[in-house]
Amino acid sequence: LYAEIIPLLTYGLIDLMKKVEGNTGVRLLECINPIKNKWRVRWDVQPGENGSATYMEEEFDHRPTEDEIRSTVITWHNRETDKDILSGFTYENVPVWLSSENQFNYKAAYDLAVQTAGATLPVVFKFGTDTEPVYREFATLEDLTDFYTKAMQHIQNTLADGWKKKDVFDLSLYAVD
């Protein structure tokens, strides 16, 4: 956590990123206190009902540079993509935690099963949550292939979605008159 916060502090971050409720016409870059030179950067504006919206916001103790704005928004998209990869996958309606370690273990088990024509099966993986674990046994190569392919497809789709969101980032929307 400290490794993530310290670089952000060097950019003059006062508060950590937070989700805020406001209106759809909110300015993406706004000086909220000219005397103290406090600025807010906003992104991911999601319209709600009756002109309301939710959005992410980060406060700076100076007018952020274009690089700081870009870095703030892109860093958030990267973190959201990572979170979706880690905790956004379900298999047979059971959540599957796709940490790097788990991805490695799933790949190793799958590769070994393929290389041995299934001789290393069955293999058991723990899915679900710590409070509600589900132990899933894969007894056939076809069964394990189905799981592994779907897990990898989830990762690829999530990465592609994250790339699209970063690709449409438009710094010109942060111009101040």
Map each language-model feature to its residues.
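A preference for well-ordered globular domain cores
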Residues: 2-177
